[in-house]
Amino acid sequence: MLKKQPIKRKKTLLERSSTIVSVNENFEKIDLNDYKIEYKVCKTNLGFTYICKNKKMNKLYFMKIFKKAKLLASKDIEHVTNEYLILSSVYHPFIIELRGINNTNPITLNFLYEYIPGGSLNTLLKIQKRLPLNSARFYLASIITAFDYLHKKNIIYRDLRPQNILFNKNGYIKLSEFGLAKKLENEVTFTMCGTPEYYSPEMIRKNGYNKSTDFWSLGILLYEMLIGCTPFFDSDPLKIYQKINQGKILFPKKIDKNAKLIIKHFLNMNQNERLGCTKNGIADIVEEPFFKNFDWKNLLFHNLEAPFIPEINGNLDTSNYKKMEDKIEIDDENIEIDKEKDPFYNW
């Protein structure tokens, strides 16, 4: 007697999207003499991000500059190494491209990224306070698509927040800042990192977490886009942790019912039952009423009209990024690292 074969569930386009994007083929070693620093736009834990111009091509880029001596002293080389290894091996329409590095300079380690001219979601939220439902849905779907691609490579992002979501000239988003991203070698990891208001309960409790913490952060982001603040905000970090552990979410009366539902599903305190973490994975997200009739295919191929188009005047426009005030930093001393002691030299 023939055994009845199980019916295989057809994969959604979102699940198949990882097959159309592969490794970053634009990555190369760079000559620092080809670039002119325009101005500083951002400080990270380990370095600064600048807008710079390729003098030969007359083209803008982001450049992240780390002092090697500071990296070695901080014993935090892992985050920089992770960013290099991950971004040099991924390529996706919603993830910023690492275009090259210079690792042979004895003083600095330099990462060169594509320039994303439209500013950040954080800036847009400061202007608009809260976003229309369709705008929030568009951006959330884009991030879900990027997360699905990363998760299929066993990479977790761990740093979702409006500041790290940038707009290209057409209003589509790019995830940036991969210093906290990690490729999971084991099933779980335990490090507390990211923005406290976006911490998942399992991260705070140090129970071990995986992609579950990324799905939690999607619920926090959607709430912030629609309401104008995060659901567990408090000026005291310890109270933020307490609120997250309690898991009580307060919603305004006028919030869309399907938005409220998907936020609750993402902010499920049980990480094994959380939306995106169950057996059906990403398919459960696609089938949420919040995404009913949403065109995932045309989103992926940039065929949808973005809800917000940033104002950009030419290829050299930097007006969407505020110039960071130059201050004397503790690590401004130019300490050279010998090749023999330089862990970055042979990358």
In which residue ranges do the predicted regions lie?
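Protein kinase glycine-rich loop
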Residues: E38-T49
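Glycine-rich ATP phosphate-binding loop
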Residues: F48-K68
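Short beta-strand micro-motifs within the conserved protein kinase catalytic domain, predominantly
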Residues: E97-I107
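Conserved short submotifs of the Hanks-type protein kinase catalytic core
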Residues: I107-S120
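Activation segment signature within eukaryotic-like protein kinase domains
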Residues: Y139-L140
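C-terminal regulatory tails of eukaryotic serine/threonine kinases
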Residues: C277-W347
